[in-house]
């Protein structure tokens, strides 16, 4: 979950009621269908189906690339994945999404922070292998597809019943704090740690913090990118960066895909794995689907279009789900809709789908530049640690904001029990073995919250 995911989680809950009223449509939208519009919160210069002049369009597309870049590369760097694959998957995923939605929604898909904790734990439990992590994200994408079919057939009331704020809030907190120890270790705040690494982490943290609090305009949209660049330059000055990988890399290289079959050595291989480590990743879909609804509601208000009606929530979920499965199949992280790019649309007042499409093509091109991706791989762990301290903390804090914004009443014992059980089980290292399936961490926390919410009787104030 990136800063974009953090912000959109806040928007998701207080706008959910509006979103639920906007959900209709079909998987196949006839070309003759009347475009459904509402009052826009922004006076757009270019609407969704309009195109800018060629040169202006290229510049606008690069602006979207800059907006998504910091968060998109940070996820694979934290997880130890090839950055080139994440860039490739974000570009392909965006094009898949646009195809599924009939090129009607100006959304960019990038790496999702929500899955970092679960994927990292799956890798750790598998001895560093990515089998469970990649399989879990592939299946998560398929869950999106199933939910899309469910929305098409049965509407959305069942989603709202499963995902009240008292479940969503604690789950976000568990996701945010699940890897707090890893962030502290990477930052160098451990016994015997190098003071240089700790100093780099502090500088990186402060750059991101100041930009988030004082930045204006476009600077406010890309705090991750500026923080990574600033921390990296500082690390270079302290002699913590090794440029040998950049010197050895080719200018043009095929992205370092991981594939679930033997390619004769052309690419690395992982095996599809359906064990408990894989199952533990699936409940993350609960949070990301809710965020998906919130993101599209906000974008609908900016563009003055009811995207949850046309092309419909089922089609946007379908595109997001297929894109996520394809990314994981290729060895990349999960994809998600990016609020940073929605912010760019609000700032530039240009909602042209063609601009987003060209940004996706630029990301695809960057994934083949070997020197470029090698340079990114030289970013020290201390830079990532400084970013992660802020990132994980903000994610957890926004779980609290969800509870506050939705006015979850903790004077009611029912709500107190649900949140307490989720937090203790999610952060306390609890595991539950049910035959061949073992639930732990985020998965156990999510299932506990959902079950308690369904079975505990409601109280009156």
Regions found by a protein language model. Name each.
Residues 32, 42-55, 77-98, 280-353:
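Membrane-embedded helical hairpins/re-entrant loop segments and their flanking transmembrane helices
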Residues 41, 69-70, 204-214, 222, ...:
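Juxtamembrane interface elements at the cytosolic ends of transmembrane helices
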Residues 55-71, 196-204, 222-223, 238, ...:
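Hydrophobic, membrane-embedded alpha-helices of multi-pass small-molecule transporters
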């Amino acid at each position: 979950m990136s800063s974009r995911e953090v912000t959109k989680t806040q928007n998701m809950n207080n706008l959910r009621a509006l979103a639920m009223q906007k959900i209709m449509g079909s998987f196949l939208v006839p070309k003759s269908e009347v475009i459904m519009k509402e009052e826009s919160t922004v006076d757009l210069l270019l609407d969704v189906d309009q195109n800018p002049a060629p040169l202006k369009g290229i510049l606008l597309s690069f602006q979207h690339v800059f907006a998504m870049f910091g968060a998109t590369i940070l996820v694979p760097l934290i997880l130890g994945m090839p950055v080139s694959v994440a860039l490739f998957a974000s570009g392909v995923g965006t094009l898949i999404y646009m195809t599924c939605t009939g090129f009607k929604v100006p959304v960019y898909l990038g790496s999702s922070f929500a899955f970092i904790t679960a994927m990292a734990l799956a890798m750790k439990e598998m001895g560093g292998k990515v089998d469970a992590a990649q399989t879990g994200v592939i299946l998560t994408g398929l869950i999106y597809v199933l939910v899309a079919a469910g929305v098409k057939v049965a509407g959305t009331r069942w989603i709202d019943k499963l995902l009240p704020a008292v479940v969503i809030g604690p789950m976000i907190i568990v996701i945010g704090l699940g890897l707090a120890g890893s962030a502290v270790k990477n930052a160098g705040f451990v016994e015997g740690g190098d003071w240089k690494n700790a100093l780099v982490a502090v500088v990186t943290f402060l750059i991101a913090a100041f930009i988030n609090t004082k930045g204006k305009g476009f600077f406010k949209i890309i705090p991750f990118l500026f923080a990574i660049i600033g921390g990296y330059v500082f690390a270079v000055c302290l002699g913590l960066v090794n440029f040998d990988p950049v010197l050895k890399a080719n200018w043009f290289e095929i992205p370092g895909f991981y594939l679930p079959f033997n390619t004769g050595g052309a690419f690395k291989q992982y095996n599809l794995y359906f064990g408990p480590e894989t199952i533990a990743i699936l409940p993350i879909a609960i949070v990301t689907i809710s965020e998906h609804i919130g993101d599209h509601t906000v974008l609908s208000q900016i563009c003055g279009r009811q995207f949850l009606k046309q092309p419909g929530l089922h089609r946007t979920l379908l595109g997001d789900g297929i894109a996520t499965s394809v990314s994981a199949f290729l060895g990349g992280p999960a994809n998600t809709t990016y609020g940073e790019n929605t912010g760019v649309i609000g700032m530039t007042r240009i909602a042209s789908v063609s601009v987003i499409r060209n940004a996706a093509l630029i990301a695809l091109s960057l994934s083949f530049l070997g020197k470029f991706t090698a340079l990114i791989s030289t970013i020290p762990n201390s830079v990532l640690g400084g970013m992660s301290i802020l990132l994980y903390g903000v994610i957890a804090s926004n779980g609290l904001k969800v509870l506050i914004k939705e006015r979850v009443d903790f004077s009611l014992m029912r709500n107190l029990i649900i949140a307490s059980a989720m937090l203790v089980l999610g952060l306390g290292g609890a595991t539950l073995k049910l035959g061949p399936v073992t639930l732990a961490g985020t998965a156990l926390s999510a299932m506990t919250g959902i079950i308690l919410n369904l079975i505990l009787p409601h109280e009156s104030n």
